Amino acid sequence: MKLNFISKSWRRSLKYLLPILFLIPLFAVLLAGRSPWAIAQSPRQEIRGVWLTINDIDVLKDRAKVRDAVSQLARLNFNTIYPVVWNSGYVIYPSAVAQRMGIQPFVYHGRQGQDLLADLIIEAHRQGLLVIPWFEFGFMTPPTSELALNHPNWITQRRDGSQTWNSAAGEVVSLNPFLPEVQQFITDLVLEIVSQYDVDGIQFDDHMSLPRELGYDRYTIDLYVRETKKNPHPDSQNPEWVRWRANKITAFMERLNKAVKANKPHAIFSVAPASYDFAYKAHLQDWRAWVQKNIVDELIVQIYLSDLQSFLEKINRPEIQEAQQKIPTGVGILTGLRNKPIPMQQVQSQVLAARDRGLGVCFFFYESLWDYAPEPIAERQARFQSLFPIPARRFASHGFAIE
């Protein structure tokens, strides 16, 4: 015989009490100043972003232009801005770290004397967009920068002793990502941004890596010998030598993530690398492992291709599909360069292909959205509006959501 220990009146009370009990943790979180939905990002949060590069500095310096730019992005239903904060060995915000290191003899200010990053954050948040500063140059710096000149022992090299290499930004050298002093310097800059500004995260890109032909400096050789009991392979493509260096970069990114989260637990730790095969084999950037190890909260893979079929092959890769199951994932799409305008038809076809596969998008770069374009500004903006006819919800670390 089944015993009924709960009276009918008590069962009626439970009917009303259970929803209240369910809501108690929710209100506790809200009272603590955090949105419960901001604790972990859903993989289904759609990224609609744009990078503000050093080429956009004239926009960033002018308060009215910032307001207009953010208003336009909000009107077109974008939800995330990635402003550059680290480029060519310099930061674009007042930095005690840079001043202490003696690597920056100037400070970027707006035309009205404002802090560029703080001004952008205030305006973007007012209009419902996230701001995730972009640590563009990573370990890369020009050989003529104060950083390279003042710290020559921080620069790594090839087997023949040469150091410089040609990037899209011109001639550069690479800071040694395995050197503790370099790791501490990068960490200090990143934590300065995360702790002093109301940012929604921090982003690193394909330059948080090392060209595979580098790493033959004295410190790295000694470290490799100490750990493996053998010399680095003379062939920079040797799988074991590649794996060891890639693992070291992964370990640093894991520590950097923990440092960021210790300062701002809900900050989005974003990475925007190149396609995986190239990133790992050519630049020792094992971002697939970063995703698997839960180092990354958001992934945007740069796929700057004009041919649609080649673009489709890249976005259909299994490592992208794998990331999609865990975190918000998107594709970096080129909207043009100052000397290379991109027709809107190409942009539209790539956006539609990405979104059809559940991927978000981020455009490189802001002024090429419509200022450096083959089509008139009004037409270009109207076609962006047709791509994003309704807003996309995105949750921020401080609790507001894009409706």
Where are these regions (language model features)?
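Glycine-rich, aromatic-flanked loop segments that form ligand/cofactor-binding clefts
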Residues: 78-85, 116-165, 203-206
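Aromatic-lined carbohydrate-binding/catalytic grooves of carbohydrate-active enzymes
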Residues: 78-112
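Substrate-binding cleft of secreted/luminal carbohydrate-active enzymes
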Residues: 297-311, 318, 327-403
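The substrate-binding groove and active-site-proximal loops of carbohydrate-active enzymes
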Residues: 52-60, 99-113, 169-184, 238-248, ...
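Active-site-adjacent "subsite" loops/lids of carbohydrate-active enzymes
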Residues: 45-48, 57-60, 138-192, 196
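Aromatic- and acidic-residue-enriched segments that line the glycan-binding/catalytic groove
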Residues: 93-105, 139-166, 206-233
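Glycoside hydrolase catalytic-domain groove-lining segments
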Residues: 227-340
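Catalytic domains of carbohydrate-active enzymes, especially glycoside hydrolases
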Residues: 65-91, 197, 296
